Design a protein with these regions (language model features):
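Catalytic domains that recognize anionic headgroups
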Residues: 1-149
Length: 149
């Protein structure tokens, strides 16, 4: 994890001092992972700052979850539950909300609903207002017709 964050996000210590997982303690792995989360948070905050004064939406999907010692498993190479619940978020500017209130209303209505990464494609198309024969609004979190894929 150490290569995924810089000094500004190196808060949790001790962190990884080796690329060999077996050489690291549970605490080092957790701290290193937490530092990567700080780096991701900072990155997303920087993007939001760039978009804040525009009519814009940001959609973030993590590509996978992470195992942090559950059942003795670490990282994301094994098939287990934490990998099936990756992080996701949608942020929109005030200007986007003023321009597309129905889209924002639908996103708010769907905010606690489960989603799969397969909905990302349809959500992005719908949020951008791209109408296409391949757009499935039942797979879009921007739609009142959303149904978990």
């Amino acid at each position: 994890y150490g290569s995924h964050y810089g000094e500004r996000d190196d808060l949790f210590r001790p962190d990884a001092d080796s690329r060999e997982i077996s050489a690291l303690s549970h605490e080092q792995l957790i701290n290193s992972y937490d530092n990567t989360i700080l780096a991701t948070d900072d990155f997303l905050a920087d993007i939001i700052d760039l978009l804040r004064d525009r009519r814009a939406i940001m959609i973030y999907y993590s590509d996978h979850g992470e195992s942090l010692g559950e059942n003795g498993r670490y990282l994301h190479g094994a098939e287990n539950a934490p990998l099936h619940h990756p992080a996701a978020m949608i942020w929109w500017s005030d200007e986007y909300e003023k321009t597309y209130p129905a889209r924002v209303e639908a996103m708010r209505a769907n905010r606690h609903r489960r989603a799969k990464t397969t909905s990302a494609f349809h959500t992005v198309l719908d949020a951008a207002g791209i109408d296409s024969p391949v757009l499935d609004r039942e797979a879009s979190l921007v739609s009142h017709g959303y149904r978990r894929p």
